[in-house]
Amino acid sequence: MILLVNGGAATSIHPNAARFYRIGTMSRQIHGAVSSSKHISLKTQHPLSDSNSELAYGASGSETRVYTRKKRLKQEPFEPLEKYSGKGVNTHKLCGLPDIEDFAYKKTIGSPSSSRSTETSITVTSVKTAGYPPENWVEVLEGIRQMRSSEDAPVDSMGCDKAGSFLPPTERRFAVLLGALLSSQTKDQVNNAAIHRLHQNGLLTPEAVDKADESTIKELIYPVGFYTRKATYMKKIARICLVKYDGDIPSSLDDLLSLPGIGPKMAHLILHIAWNDVQGICVDTHVHRICNRLGWVSRPGTKQKTTSPEETRVALQQWLPKEEWVAINPLLVGFGQMICTPIRPRCEACSVSKLCPAAFKETSSPSSKLKKSNRSKEP
């Protein structure tokens, strides 16, 4: 007795019937082999593994099952990636995000442009050029020197370096400190006159300032900018110098910056003049304005103008030779007082205007601009 399994149901048949069944099965296998020749090309393109072949030909309905498996094998999941990459797929990076180095300095040729890719390229360009001197800076600097030598500016005779120049070293350093404190938001002529009045009243030493009434100091330094606040600062600074520095002034940048009313510009200027210590460039409003007009400085990673004198100082120190750090301040301050003025600069009198990207862009007076706007409104 033989059990025949068909579609999950077991059936018993006679031995003779089983013999005829085996013969019929063999004939069907021969017929299936002939008919399967139609699929030779399909087998060549997508060969099955040995295990799949056994599954395909070991049961009824073999042709249908073979065709179904071959159709599934055609679906290759990585094929679409090759259409966009332009080269073979790097399989060990498929499951993770690309490294940052892949985007930092490389640009795919023929890739569609976008605003994000444009910003990245600008940033990379700015980073590459950071720390390198601007084009023609030597020629521009020499031209400014020649213009400055032909005409004196207020800073040449009334700058902070002239404060207390006739005093002993310790007293002179304190006078330089006071001159720097009073100089902010104040013209050199006004500042120099205030220092002269303090000297006439014996108030250029920390002992004298500490004992003086604050109201008296206010009257003597008026009309410097913020004279009320600066009188208060003078009293506090005098006390600090007496208590911490034995009547002298601080000799380090950090200690100077700890004094009330003293910022980076003043601290570097005081170190230059009082202690002959060069640790940075003194950048005031004139130096800040002129460096931006000349295109000498920009904000980190951009081509935009710097927004503060301190930001200008950091950018300028990245490329300006250190031997120029002291001279650049009075040079550009005088140039800003006489030619490259804050309002309506004299570009027509500037010998380096052809090298200045901002030349003749701020020379129009407000009245002329108003006239032009009125003309445009006329019918």
From Swiss-Prot:
Q: Where in the cell is it found?
A: Plastid, Chloroplast stroma, Chloroplast nucleoid
Q: PROSITE patterns in the record, alphabetically?
A: ENDONUCLEASE_III_1, ENDONUCLEASE_III_2
User: SMART domains under this entry?
Assistant: ENDO3c, FES
State the superkingdom.
Answer: Eukaryota
The Gene Ontology biological process terms listed for this entry are: base-excision repair; base-excision repair, AP site formation
- Primary localisation category: plastid
* Cofactor(s) for this UniProt protein: [4Fe-4S] cluster
Catalytic site: 265 (nucleophile)
- The reply on keyword Lyase is yes
Span of the transit peptide along the chain = 1-54
Residues binding [4Fe-4S] cluster? 340, 347, 350, 356
Keyword vocabulary terms for this entry: 4Fe-4S, Chloroplast, DNA damage, DNA repair, Glycosidase, Hydrolase, Iron, Iron-sulfur, Lyase, Metal-binding, Plastid, Transit peptide
Q: Name one Pfam family in it.
A: HHH
The record's comment on cofactor binding reads: Binds 1 [4Fe-4S] cluster. The cluster does not appear to play a role in catalysis, but is probably involved in the proper positioning of the enzyme along the DNA strand.
Q: Upon deletion of the gene, what happens? A: No effect on chloroplastic glycosylase-lyase/endonuclease activity, probably due to function redundancy.
Q: Which InterPro entries match?
A: DNA_glycosylase, Endonuclease-III-like_CS2, Endonuclease3_FeS-loop_motif, Endouclease-III_FeS-bd_BS, HhH-GPD_domain, HhH_base_excis_C, HhH_motif, NTH1
Q: Where is the HhH domain?
A: 244-272
In this chain, the site described as Important for catalytic activity is at: 284
Asked if the Swiss-Prot or TrEMBL record annotates the protein with the keyword 4Fe-4S, the reply is yes
Task: Supply the HAMAP family for this chain.
Answer: Endonuclease_III_Nth
Q: Which family does it belong to?
A: Belongs to the Nth/MutY family.
Official protein name in the record: Endonuclease III homolog 1, chloroplastic
Q: Which organism is it from?
A: Arabidopsis thaliana (Mouse-ear cress)
Q: What is the lineage of its organism?
A: Eukaryota, Viridiplantae, Streptophyta, Embryophyta, Tracheophyta
